A protein has these predicted regions:
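A general structural motif
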Residues: 29-31, 60-62, 141, 189-191
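Short amphipathic alpha-helical segments
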Residues: 17-18, 48-49, 78-79, 157, ...
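Acidic, His/Gly-enriched loop-helix segments that form or flank divalent-metal centers
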Residues: 100, 108-235, 241-245
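Active-site environment of divalent metal-dependent phosphoester hydrolases
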Residues: 10-14, 42-45, 71-75, 197-205, ...
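Short beta-strand-to-coil "C-cap" segments at the C-terminal boundary of structured domains/repeats
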Residues: 251-254
Length: 254
């Protein structure tokens, strides 16, 4: 069995598939499974294709889907629409556009509240899929897959004792810069945490201090800043796809 791990695809289906295929993924090979470390949607223009891929993998028992903050933002945005008070970040982060892609409705109909019933009907399969298929974290051998980080205490710099519990503060952990949490000491002995959410160039720039955080794209090898940040107990893989145009893919084999 091979496990292909991606994160923060943000509706860039082609970039995701390019990364998967380049790393040997075969959609027809039932022993090839996919981990998505959250944020499958928003920002890009291929939300529907990403959803169709995820539903196919889930139907075949080949998907591990970790809940990201943008999945939560999707629910928040729909709630805002129902209350006719859509906050600006839902527009700037691309969540409204994601709903437009899934529903075929335009910006003014959604924000004006004219087509709420139609929107709710068309979004229901997407929301139900997220509810039924996402988890706070997934594990494989000595690897733990999360979106931001595992629940931890910034003061004690330790991982919460109850981090595996459904009562743990995963809502906050999803927004955590995992590299920063790891750096301050929130680690799990003998485990490697694979995370997304925060562009991995942050770790190269601020922690390893060997690459620019946002190098100009006319620089030679600028893409290297966005390669996975790897250190003892952490692999951060968010490639900042909306900026770089590519997705990182980690391959693990049983």
């Amino acid at each position: 069995m091979k496990i292909f791990v991606v994160s923060d695809v943000h509706s860039y289906y082609d970039a995701m598939m390019d990364a998967l295929i380049a790393n040997g993924f075969d959609i027809n090979n039932k022993s090839h499974k996919v981990v998505i470390c959250g944020d499958l949607f928003d920002r890009g223009k291929q939300a529907v294709k990403c959803f169709e891929f995820a539903t196919q993998m889930a139907a075949e028992g080949r998907l591990y889907y970790v809940l990201g903050n943008h999945e939560e933002l999707l629910f928040d945005c729909i709630n805002d629409m129902q209350c006719r008070n859509v906050r600006e970040h839902h527009i700037t982060h691309g969540t409204v556009d994601t709903i437009m892609q899934f529903t075929g409705l335009n910006y003014y109909d959604l924000l004006g509240g004219w087509c709420l019933d139609e929107m709710e009907v068309k979004m229901k399969p997407v929301l139900d899929f997220i509810i039924d298929n996402t988890v706070d974290f997934a594990t494989f051998e000595d690897y733990i897959f999360v979106h931001g980080w595992v629940p931890s205490d910034a003061k004690t710099r330790k991982v919460d004792d109850n981090w595996t519990s459904v009562d743990a503060n995963w809502a906050a952990a999803r927004w955590e810069n995992g590299m920063q949490a790891w750096h301050r000491g929130a680690r799990i002995p003998d485990k490697t945490i694979v995370c997304g959410h925060w562009h991995c160039s942050w770790g190269h720039s601020h922690l390893h201090q060997d690459r620019k955080e946002f190098p100009a794209k006319n620089r030679v090898d600028w893409q290297k800043s966005f390669e996975p940040f790897i250190d003892d107990g952490i692999i951060a893989i968010d490639a900042c796809t909306a900026y770089t145009g590519f997705v990182n893919c980690l391959v693990l084999e049983a």
